[in-house]
Amino acid sequence: MAPPPPAPPSVTLRTVLLLLRVLTAAFLLITVVLISTNTVTLEISSTSIKLPFNDVYAYRYMLSAAVIGLVYAVVQLFLTISQFATGKTHPLTYQFDFYGDKVISYLLATGSAAGFGVSKDLKDTYIALIEFDSTDPVDKFFSKGYASASLLLFAFVSLAVLSVFSSLALSKRPVPVS
């Protein structure tokens, strides 16, 4: 006789998972808005040079990671709400959660690292070339880069916690009887 299937996650655990999914999506949405609106106009020798975020490759990568993560987070949010409402979980959901959480969390981590790295390097280079203070618009440009990278890092941490839960859920999933 086959062992009884494990009990579905408790309502409290489902609520925590739902809140983590919402938190991840919120962090990613704010990241996308911040980085996509990041632009600065440099005044060098009476010449104006507009520097939008997409002129910096690492910021483009960061935006791409955030958008991909946001799409995944929204899909997962709908799946989690569906599971929460019905109390039923499709057998393939365990694997989708497991692999998706792992891949997307690493994508978010690398996007965050790229954002931190390029913000520091470009700011240090700019400081070496031109003296500026905290009221300079260039400082605001780099501050938005740091803020976006920080939010992407928070989204990674949130998704990494979800990844632990999806690993546990996969190992305890009900095995279909043939």
UniProtKB/Swiss-Prot annotation:
UniProt tissue specificity: Expressed in the root epidermis.
Keyword flag Hydrolase: no
Extracellular domain ranges by topology: 36-60, 119-149
Subcellular location: Cell membrane
Gene Ontology CC: plasma membrane
Assembly and oligomerization: Homodimer and heterodimers.
Protein name as catalogued: CASP-like protein 4D1
